[in-house]
Amino acid sequence: MAVEIEGRITNINPEEVKAKLLAIGAKPLGFYNFRRYVFDPAIGAPHRWLRLRTDGNKTTLTFKELSNDSFSGTEEWEIEVSDFETTLEILEKTGIKHRSYQENTRDEYEYHGAKISIDHWPKLGYLLEIEVEKEEDIYDITSKLGFNPQDIVSANHADLYQNIGIDVNSCDVLKF
């Protein structure tokens, strides 16, 4: 199990942020087109979910549990699986039905051990996601990119969608 420590900045200009990342020495890791199925593992557990995700090359199965809304409020357990479609079929044959299908893109960078992503989500637009080992690194990196501390949110994607009037937990398909 790992605790995710991540912060987000919404409504960014992806080209400006990419230029700033390169200017501070961030290393490009790749551009990904993600497809995912999200499952509810238990009735009455809205803050727990299972995610099957692929970028076409790497496929992972991840269980996530949100304990609070802080930067470090999500725990995750993740394994790599070899076949996206077969894993989906196995999960559904056990009776676990997916609640939604989702797509997003990610332009990912590494900077002094931090994973920094420019994500694009349908109807949500572009956002910056920074995953670090220590919470204070979120503030350090965003400052170097020209953002203010009040620009940073710890909200998860479901909350960000809720802020624009979309209940992502009731949305069967979320794609471009």
Language model region names:
Residues 1-113, 148-176:
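N-terminal strand-loop-strand beta-hairpin
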Residues 115-121:
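Strongly charged, low-complexity linkers/loops
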Residues 10, 133-135:
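Short amphipathic alpha-helical "recognition" segments used for binding
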Residues 138-150:
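Long, well-ordered alpha-helical scaffolding segments within enzyme catalytic domains
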Residues 121-123, 133:
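Secondary-structure transition motif
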